[in-house]
Amino acid sequence: MNVRANRVSEQMKKELGDILNRKIKDPRLGFVTVTGVDVTGDLQEAKVFISILGTDKEKENTLLALAKAHGFIRSEIGRRIRLRKVPEMSFEIDNSIAYGNRIDELLRDLNNDQ
């Protein structure tokens, strides 16, 4: 990724966090945290990695709410960030936090056994 793509990625992450927490009023939207945004070098596509707190059903409902609000989110990003073309976004669940917690739990269990 080039320098401009990195800058756009960080700005999108910040703005998406604000939009998801303050602007979208969908009750299906659970507790969502934007953990990262990967923007392609040509700024045409962006993968938005999110962490969702809750059950699998709540995660599924949150993804449905995000899919429904996709157009609104994209237009808000367009208003907040000056770009010629707003990247097409896809939302993916980031399981790295749960994975990290599991590793931490296993390490604690090992220390308690010793």
Curated annotation (Swiss-Prot):
GO terms for cellular component: cytosol. Keywords: Cytoplasm, Ribosome biogenesis. Transmembrane segments: none annotated. The keyword Protease does not apply. One of its GO terms (biological process) is ribosome biogenesis. It is found in: Cytoplasm. PANTHER family: RIBOSOME-BINDING FACTOR A, CHLOROPLASTIC-RELATED. Monomer. Binds 30S ribosomal subunits, but not 50S ribosomal subunits or 70S ribosomes. One of several proteins that assist in the late maturation steps of the functional core of the 30S ribosomal subunit. Associates with free 30S ribosomal subunits (but not with 30S subunits that are part of 70S ribosomes or polysomes). Required for efficient processing of 16S rRNA. May interact with the 5'-terminal helix region of 16S rRNA. Belongs to the RbfA family. This is Ribosome-binding factor A. It comes from Listeria monocytogenes serovar 1/2a (strain ATCC BAA-679 / EGD-e).
